[in-house]
A protein has these predicted regions:
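N-terminal accessory/pre-domain segments preceding catalytic cores
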Residues: 4-170
Length: 170
């Protein structure tokens, strides 16, 4: 489609930047592209995701890691964050103390392939998917994260946990 062609053109320029930034992890990103070479739509999605990755990073520091561990433990045990714990997290300042790690330098091919496949599965499985064109899919459903968090398997976790609920709604 015209949208895919436009995105592929834009992605070529940005993808080169991402692949250069990836350094020794470049092979992982190229494996994703090779994996989808026979599926034009998933290949276009992979190109979009990799091109968009050039500015994605997460921060690492002892302070962030300890606060994150406390938040994860709390949310898993209690199902919500107490106000004082949330306020401590929001007040935490890590500027200058954290190391910036670019996703392009660390994400694996397996991680990106799983993310792409699960995003397509959700888009095609549920009736609401027909209201989203490919550009909307790439912008809103495909991304593997929404901020500066470390990439994780959130999509797999949420799919396994909530698919039965979603299936019962449709």
């Amino acid at each position: 489609t015209a949208c895919q062609n436009h995105m592929t053109h834009v992605s070529q320029r940005d993808m080169k930047s991402t692949l250069a930034l990836a350094g020794s992890n470049r092979d992982e990103l190229e494996r994703v592209l090779e994996h989808y070479q026979d599926d034009p739509q998933k290949l276009a999605a992979a190109r979009y995701l990799i091109a968009d990755m050039k500015d994605n990073y997460y921060l690492v520091s002892d302070g962030i890691d300890s606060v994150h561990a406390a938040l994860v433990t709390t949310s898993l045990q209690e199902g919500f964050l107490e106000r004082n714990r949330r306020d401590r997290w929001m007040a935490y300042r890590y500027e200058g103390t954290a190391e910036k790690i670019y996703d392009a330098q660390t994400v694996s091919a397996e991680y990106l392939i799983e993310n792409i496949d699960l995003a397509f599965e959700s888009w095609q499985r549920y009736p609401w998917g027909k209201y989203y064109d490919f550009e909307d899919f790439c912008n809103y459903l495909l991304p593997y994260k929404i901020g500066d968090e470390k990439p994780d398997n959130w999509r797999r976790i949420y799919t396994e946990k909530f698919a039965p609920v979603l299936d019962s709604l449709y």
